[in-house]
A protein has these predicted regions:
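N- or domain-start disorder-to-order transition segments that initiate the globular core
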Residues: 1-24
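Catalytic beta/alpha-barrel core
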Residues: 14, 127-136, 151-163
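An N-terminal structural lobe/cap that precedes and organizes the functional/catalytic core
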Residues: 20-56
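Glycine-enriched alpha-helix->loop->beta-strand junction motifs that scaffold or abut catalytic
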Residues: 33-35, 142-153
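Conserved, mostly hydrophobic/aromatic
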Residues: 40, 100, 131, 146, ...
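Active-site beta->alpha loop and helix N-cap motifs at the rims of alpha/beta catalytic domains
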Residues: 43-140
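Short, charged, surface-exposed secondary-structure boundary motifs
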Residues: 47-48, 162-168
Length: 168
């Protein structure tokens, strides 16, 4: 039995890396060890700088600015993770999600967070994607607006019950 089957508990993988997606990630999904995954800029930075799997795409993107390069690499991996998790999501709408975080520099900019959240969600174009938003005053506004548009949201950086309540 699994935690999901035993107590309806879903584990999410907090790691994304291109080679991992094609090997262990597939395996732990198949074995029902995880039911979703999340990412953030720090995870991607570590993956991109420590894996040769990104070299070809990095070479093709080298003329772009850092944000564009990061987004292209991250979106490629998020789209792949969404595809790998899609069967889980089809079988249980509460599972099979992958999340991508908005630019952390937007944490105090509700309008910027909303704009970026809509853009990221649209560019990935998968029902099982969540936009990860920090639990700040601006983030609460963005969370409400994005969910009203039918965009899945993953609240992050919650350190108190008060913050958690404000995310609803």
């Amino acid at each position: 039995m699994s935690l999901k089957e035993d107590i309806n508990f879903s584990l999410w993988c907090d790691f994304i890396e291109r080679d991992f997606l094609e090997t262990r990630f597939k395996e732990i999904i198949k074995k029902k060890i995880i039911q979703g995954a999340t990412s953030n800029p720090a995870i991607f930075e570590s993956s991109i700088t420590n894996s040769l799997a990104y070299k070809q795409q990095l070479d093709m993107l080298q003329a772009n600015n850092a944000k564009t390069i990061y987004e292209e690499l991250a979106l490629t991996d998020i789209k792949r993770a969404a595809a790998l998790l899609s069967d889980l999501h089809k079988n249980d709408a509460d599972d099979g999600f992958i999340s991508i975080e908005v630019d952390p520099l937007l944490c105090d900019d509700a309008a910027g967070t909303i704009e970026e959240g809509v853009r990221l969600y649209s560019s990935i174009s998968a029902d099982n994607v969540m936009i990860k938003i920090p639990a700040t005053q601006a983030g609460y506004i963005a969370m409400r607006e994005l969910t009203s548009k039918g965009i899945n949201v993953n609240a992050t950086l919650i350190f108190s019950p008060e913050q958690a309540i404000k995310c609803t």
